[in-house]
């Protein structure tokens, strides 16, 4: 799953970012429509939706992609139980980075999923497997 959420079209989007963060996510996450080239609506990862998908599909491992985009956001957030949860800025997408490690621990805590992997960039081999 992406480290943030995107949406096209109308309808509710309770985790939508402020415009400044939305522009950063669209730019560094390459979130533009294939046909129109318009930027997609961007928001914070919605753990209410994530937990519903985990429950419905029996997920026991999550792979977080586009985490490198968070290094461009001053105050990243996640959305849980209709509230935004702020996190410290992430300097490096690495388990050695305290802020990034706290994000991984937060995800484990909010989802009850014990295994997480994440990507550090857009290339095929840029994945880190965690236990």
Describe each PLM feature range:
Residues 1-131:
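Non-transmembrane, aqueous-exposed alpha-helical and coiled segments at domain scale
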